[in-house]
Amino acid sequence: MNALASKEGFYKALLAYADDSVVKPQEGELPVIGKAALETYWSDKPDTKDISWQPYKAEASKSGDLGYTLGNWKLVSKDTTLYGNYYTIWKKQPDGKWKFTVDGGNTTPRP
């Protein structure tokens, strides 16, 4: 996803890996529910290619159809650099690919 975000933008990368029933909590707002709603929510917001993230923990269920990742992210802009952490819950699709069903995070002090 990092490579896709660097090339196409953060929002486009997330949409490429989002399950149709995705839930995306938003700071100070109700969560956005559904891939189409998420695409609409982001349609008027500026996208960025200057974000990267690195998982530090990943686990999958015994059945192999659900999993999660935890990690850190970094956003570099002209005037500042922001840091944070994230959580993502993944669901295996019928075609064997993984899509995320829940994704959220927050800002943190510099590591």
What are these regions (language model features)?
Residues 1-2, 66-70, 89-90, 98:
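Short, structured motif recognition centered on aromatic/hydrophobic residues
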Residues 3-7, 16, 42, 76-78, ...:
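Long compositionally biased, domain-poor regions of proteins
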Residues 9-62:
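A solvent-exposed, acidic/Ser-Thr-rich amphipathic alpha-helical stretch
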Residues 18, 28, 62, 72-73, ...:
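A mature extracytoplasmic/lumenal domain signature
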Residues 42, 55-59, 72-75, 85-92:
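Hydrophobic/aromatic beta-strand elements that line small-molecule binding cavities or substrate pockets
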Residues 47-49, 75-81:
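Short, cysteine-centered beta-strand-loop-beta hairpins and adjacent loop/turn segments enriched
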Residues 83-108:
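Short beta-strand edge/turn micro-motifs at domain boundaries
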